[in-house]
UniProtKB/Swiss-Prot annotation:
Disulfide bonds: none annotated. This is Large ribosomal subunit protein uL3. It holds the Pfam family Ribosomal_L3. It comes from the Bacteria. One of the primary rRNA binding proteins, it binds directly near the 3'-end of the 23S rRNA, where it nucleates assembly of the 50S subunit. Residues 131-154 are annotated as: Disordered. The gene is rplC.
Length: 210
């Protein structure tokens, strides 16, 4: 059965395996999450569960959200996300989803909002080549040619240009779960994941796992 959970990034560290080799891991506080709503094909056109994560005070929520949580009879949560699943019979409104749904060796996809870098040029943003750095050249880190003149008389879509870099939804696929700590609600995955410390992460079964 497919599964997913919400979590919060704590940062990176390293652990040692049985052979004494160093494994870089990201520490994620995953769950506990609570099922706030079940969506079915009959009522909504698709099967999904809506889960909440992170406690929050009532005064920080809008009236529609307060009513949504009270109708479900669950505590107020800061984050609400949906997981589309083929089979939702194993979930009930109010039930908890904990980190022990995963085990070491599982493969997961982790989605988050990448770190924002602010306004950046094409060299930093896309890795564009520089211009000549000497011999009187006045072109070093600029965009370069943006197209012809009369024909076509415009800049084509997709042309790399300076702009806001980062702060985008990014998914890192097929990360290995190295360790699970149910007591501390910690999930250790091999490698890095998007976002700064404390940011929200969505952890799902990997779509590429065999």
């Amino acid at each position: 059965m497919k599964k997913g959970i919400l979590g919060r990034k704590h940062g990176m560290t390293q652990i040692f395996d049985e052979k004494g080799e160093v494994i870089p891991v990201t520490v994620i506080e995953a769950g506990p999450c609570v099922v706030v709503q079940k969506k079915t094909v009959e009522t909504d056109g698709y099967n999904a569960i809506q889960v909440g994560f992170g406690d929050v005070k009532e005064k920080r929520l809008t009236k529609p959200l307060i009513g949504h949580f009270k109708k479900a009879g669950v505590p107020f949560k800061r984050y609400l996300r949906e997981f589309r699943l083929d089979d939702i019979s194993g979930y009930e409104v109010g039930s908890e989803i904990k980190v022990d749904i995963f085990k070491p060796g599982d493969r997961v996809d982790v989605t988050g909002i990448s770190k924002g870098k602010g306004f950046a040029g094409v060299v930093k943003r896309y890795g564009a080549n520089r211009g000549p750095m000497s011999h009187g050249s006045k072109y070093h880190r600029r965009v370069g040619s943006m197209g012809a003149t009369t024909d076509p008389g415009r800049t084509f879509k997709g042309k790399i240009m300076p702009g806001h870099m980062g702060h985008e939804r990014v998914t890192i696929q097929n990360l290995e779960v190295v360790k699970v700590d149910p007591e501390l609600n910690l999930l250790l995955v091999k490698g890095s994941v998007p976002g700064p410390k404390g940011s929200l992460l969505i952890i799902k079964d990997s779509v590429k796992s065999k």
